[in-house]
Amino acid sequence: MSIEWIQGACAVPDARVQAASLARQEQLTKPPGALGRLEQLAVQFAAWQRNEQPTVQRIWIAVYAADHGVAAEGVSMFPQAVTGEMVRNFARGGAAIAVLARELGARLEVVNLGVVNDPGELPRVRRAWIAPACANICEQAAMTPAQLRDALAAGAESIAQARTCGTQLFVGGEMGIGNSTAAAALSCALLSQFPQAMAGAGTGLDAEGIAHKATVITRALAVHADAATPLERLRRLGGFEIAALVGAYIAAAQAGIPVLVDGFISTAAALVAVHLNPGVREWLLFGHRSQERGHAALLRALEAEPLLQLDLRLGEASGAAVAIPLLRTACALHNGMATFAEAGVSDA
């Protein structure tokens, strides 16, 4: 399978439904704009769904797990074995995102792309194995061209499955010790930022640990200074799960499925996806502003205003999942409120 599919046209929201939904908002029993961004969200979902009565009930959450060679540089508080252990935890339903998915009635897909501490076959885990880990970005490219192709395809496969269920919202998450370092390096390359501005606490590093992380990123950027395109930067500085997120975001936009983006690492993947296929941006919402240092710069680059700011930095799609009740509320108000005419209430 080639990767030419990532350049394919994205779906276009329905302008007629958008206009009709805006007109309805103006007639609901409230002052114009009184429900603020909730009004905008409802209209956005109506246009996405081509339905003047939008809902956000069928949700597909995919968490991509993969290990990183850069973990050998001591950039995390946790050992690399944790990635595989967390895959088991996802499968057993004990992780934060598993709890949130149950609470939301969402479908949770866990995808094992390659972990050092391999848990093997597990129920409710899709095995899309590429390698035990991507390479150390301080020494060589994270992925070969074939590995990048397979990682992108693994993300697209999530969307292919989600489409068969009539999914109304896709949420992507990640798990991988060392992946905040890879995401920060990738973000530096895409935004021409200094590592000190993008390196954050990740799993809980102190100031000394963050400074070391920035030094590691500086080394990686020097090794890959000749990476000239977004795709090549992803191949050299990213990782399997970051590339899978990129593939999922592009495929979702092509399929007309809205995406709720999670935190720092997921937003770095979203930025790559938009660089590769600008039509993706129309289908992205951003769940929250992470506590991770570099997230604000990524959001600015994407002209994104996240729904929540709760000082989260867990990943796993958890922050995005927490924002889903807001989307449901927006649609419920849009669909359920009476118009002035229906209620017999005088308009202004």
Swiss-Prot record:
Keywords of the record: Cobalamin biosynthesis, Glycosyltransferase, Transferase
EC number: 2.4.2.21
Matches recorded under NCBIfam families: cobT_DBIPRT, PRK00105.1
Molecular function as annotated in GO: nicotinate-nucleotide-dimethylbenzimidazole phosphoribosyltransferase activity
Keyword Glycosyltransferase: yes
Primary role: Catalyzes the synthesis of alpha-ribazole-5'-phosphate from nicotinate mononucleotide (NAMN) and 5,6-dimethylbenzimidazole (DMB).
Residues at the active site: E316
Family per similarity comment: Belongs to the CobT family.
Record flagged with keyword Glycoprotein: no
Catalytic activity: 5,6-dimethylbenzimidazole + nicotinate beta-D-ribonucleotide = alpha-ribazole 5'-phosphate + nicotinate + H(+)
Domain of life: Bacteria
CDD domains per UniProt: DMB-PRT_CobT
Pathway(s) it belongs to: Nucleoside biosynthesis; alpha-ribazole biosynthesis; alpha-ribazole from 5,6-dimethylbenzimidazole: step 1/2
Gene Ontology biological process terms in this record: cobalamin biosynthetic process
Lineage, opening ranks: Bacteria, Pseudomonadati, Pseudomonadota, Gammaproteobacteria, Lysobacterales
SUPFAM superfamilies (UniProt xref): Nicotinate mononucleotide:5,6-dimethylbenzimidazole phosphoribosyltransferase (CobT)
UniProt-recorded name of the protein: Nicotinate-nucleotide--dimethylbenzimidazole phosphoribosyltransferase
